[in-house]
Amino acid sequence: MPVVHTCTYCGRSIEPGTGLMYVKNDGSVLWFCSSKCFKLWRMGRDPRKLKWTERYTQLRR
């Protein structure tokens, strides 16, 4: 049974067979729905400041 994950950065659901799994040196696993989310996370951008993320909408409610 395929597992549907949520994007660590934007909060959207990731369909099976898509996305990017990033494993940190401490063993924690981060899931990203697109290279856009992965690159923004690597640059240190705050997802709460981007209007298209789920974290932004949760903060503004």
From Swiss-Prot:
GO CC terms in record: ribonucleoprotein complex; ribosome
Alphabetically ordered keywords of this record: Metal-binding, Ribonucleoprotein, Ribosomal protein, RNA-binding, rRNA-binding, Zinc, Zinc-finger
InterPro entries found in the cross-reference section: L24e/L24_sf (IPR038630), Ribosomal_eL24 (IPR056366), Ribosomal_eL24-rel_arc (IPR055345), Ribosomal_eL24-rel_N (IPR000988), Ribosomal_eL24_CS (IPR023442), TRASH_dom (IPR011017)
TM segment ranges: none
Stored PROSITE patterns: RIBOSOMAL_L24E
Molecular-function GO term, any one: zinc ion binding
Zinc finger (C4-type): 7-37
Binding site for Zn(2+): 7, 10, 33, 37
Cofactor: Zn(2+)
Origin: domain of life: Archaea
One GO term of the biological process aspect: translation
Record's cofactor remark: Binds 1 zinc ion per subunit.
Family: Belongs to the eukaryotic ribosomal protein eL24 family.
Quaternary structure and partners: Part of the 50S ribosomal subunit. Forms a cluster with proteins L3 and L14.
Role: Binds to the 23S rRNA.
NCBIfam families: PRK14891.1-1
Protein name (Swiss-Prot/TrEMBL): Large ribosomal subunit protein eL24
Organism expressing this protein natively: Hyperthermus butylicus (strain DSM 5456 / JCM 9403 / PLM1-5)
